[in-house]
Amino acid sequence: MLVGVSLAEPVAIVSSTVLILIILIFLLELKLTRTIRSVGEQLQSNESQLSGYHDYNNYLQGKDRATGLRKLDSVFSSLHFVGRYQLFLRKRHRALVADYSKRADSQKTFLERFVHEYSMREVERSKDFFGTRPFDKNQLEAIVKKETYNLVLASAGSGKTRTLTARVAYTVKRGANQHDILALAYTKSAEEEMRNRLKEEYGIGDANVRTFHSLGREIAKLSPNFRTGVADNQQQPEIIRQSCDRLRSDRLFARQLLGFALELQTNEVEEKEFASREKYYDFLRYQKHTTLSGKHVKSVGERDIANFLFLNQVKFEYEAPATWADRNVGYRMYQPDFFLPEYGIWIEHWAIDRQGNVPAWFSTNQSVNPSIKYGRGMQWKRYQFQKHRRRLIQTYNYQWAEDTLIPELTQQLKENHVQLRELTTEEILDKVQMLIPRRDTLNELMFSFISKAKTNGLTMVDVTARLRQGNWSRKQRVFASLMIRIWQQYESILRENDMIDFNDMINYALQVAKSSSGKLNKYSHILIDEYQDITDPQLELIQSLLSASAGSTLFCVGDDRQNIFSFAGSNIYNILQFENRFPYAEQTVLSTNYRCPKNIVEASNFIANLNKCKVEKNVVPASKIQQPIHLFQKPGNDETLYDDWQHEKAKQLVTDLIRQKKSNEEVMVLSRFNRPLRRLELEFPQNETLGLRFLSIHRAKGTEADYVLLLSCISGKNGFPSEILDKRVLDIVQNTREDGSGKLEEERRLFYVALTRCKNQLYLFTSSTQRSQFIWETQQYLSPLTEPKHTVVPA
């Protein structure tokens, strides 16, 4: 025994520890008991609230289901906590925990499956209504869902119109007054189709089916700014054309138009559009710029100089050898940028900024700084002109960046007595026609500019201010300046004809709805067709109508894959982020394509899924029939012959199809742009009686045909995808900026729309040396041919 150590001290320590443990266990058991009691009370409360819904005769709204699931999350968290301390539970409590876990699982399953189970019971209760009508399971569920906000994602050929029409009829069957229902379509033909279906299939002859145009007009009439006439989206491009014609004799306008046509030839790209910085630099390093004279030059500065000389009728040679210069081991044969043979003058355009630095992409991982190396080359070249007494005009890349290149060049040319002979206004416009042979391409951009400005609530004053204040590219500035002049004429024509345009009308209607909601008609049920096409102001108008009538419901049908009208102001995020606008919304996917053969569905699925901006879904074909997608390719390298080749092949194919098809079958010819359609249509003056239609892809949306020809699936400025429609020129009238990918994704959606018009045989036209990107993307589904087949394959 150790001297001085008492046994009482360790005993006291052990006793204290045991006492603390006993207290902690008691407190834990108390907490566990209270937690179990709380869980039981919560489950009992849930069961009480849900008791009236277990027979599925009453509908439990999404908000209440979400609240119930949040409460269950808390229950599961508590049960998880209790489960960690099973050893401290009494037998009775363990049995309660097991029972509560089962009850919580059951409640969660009930809430998660409620909509589906309710819908199936409602379908069963509505047998008399549905009868033998051919609806699939997803269509039936969409028709009977009773949520306040509903979105039906209806893929191409999935029975969208049939489902929407049935929803209107079903709502009436449930007791709604027809006048309390508002069904909205975007086109008159879609409105008429819905009316006819309601009357013929359901005996509803007085349905309130309208276009957005007629609804907006009715409400906008209450605005003091309203005028008698309203120009729709078909009339607006014609008014833009008239606006341009009024300015045709204006030399400044002609030069502005030419300036933009020249800028359209430039690809303004950003680094984020490339997989790596090196790929971005490679693009800048090796891209060529085409001039008005057809020559290819190495930079936009050289392009602008070449175009200026051409437009002022100054003869020049590009990179002509300076045979008089010294030969230097460090340099090849010296070839200055431009030589003016009539004057013996050379022009060098130096690729440096004000600090003497070259662009970053000049670097190729060399040990020598590229700016230093370039500077040495400049010194040697300048010395050659001094030594051999040759005249040299010098320009710089920073002048191009600062928009002073042409004024500086003009001044130096005049000082050297170079005669500048400017083109006449008509000659300038001829050059514009040469650069943009397809007028509908430019009209589409112009229409988009005005439409997007008004959709975003911008006036000409606002756009002018943005132009002064923002950091815009040269192309954006040139186009905005041009469009302000056209917009002024556009508004003058509207005023002269006592008209407003469609965007004005919607904006006026929205102002009325926000300030005088008491004057609005009350609708208990609002249904919208082609929801993917809705603009922000139209959506705000719908929200105002919903707010004007307590308890009103919204039912929308659309397809994010068919959002192709951004030029008219539609915003794809209105369908992608539907629940952000309408909380607790229900979503149903109609994923069966009843229109297209199996391989067309597979090809369209593949290309749609290449887009990043989309709803994830996989469309399945109802048909198991495999029909080849015929690809006609022009052979040879001479692309100037493509239009004539395509015209003859398409004419031959259409003639054969018309002769061999059944009387009730249709042929449809589609193109990204109208020009090849107009030429081909002249060959078939009786096309309507022949069951033949010629449509741009935009106009073809919502239609179908047994045989579809898609023209001009080629690359290039006027190809598909359109490389000339640089939507970044519209950034100045938008609230967000395009990043380049948005343009390609919409073009890809347009290709998807074209493919899915076809019920039987699909024919694509391309060039073997100028294939469209979309042809490359879908090539595994295509059957290449060199000559059209002359037999019609039965559906």
Residue ranges and their predicted role:
Residues H54-N57, D180, A185-F260, Y374, ...:
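Conserved P-loop NTPase-based nucleic-acid remodeling module centered on helicase motor cores
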Residues F310-G330, D337:
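A short acidic/basic microdomain associated with nuclease active sites
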Residues Y334-G356, H388:
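Active-site beta-strand-loop-beta-strand hairpin of nuclease catalytic cores
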Residues S158-L164, E273-E278, K288, Y584-E586, ...:
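Helicase P-loop NTPase motor core
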Residues G83, S101-A156, R162-L164, L182, ...:
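Conserved helicase NTPase motor core
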Residues G377, R382-Y383, D536-L631, L725:
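Conserved RecA-like helicase ATPase core segment
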Residues L27-R227, T756-R757:
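P-loop NTPase Walker
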Residues S663-N664, N687-G691, L695, A700-P788:
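Conserved helicase C-terminal RecA-like lobe
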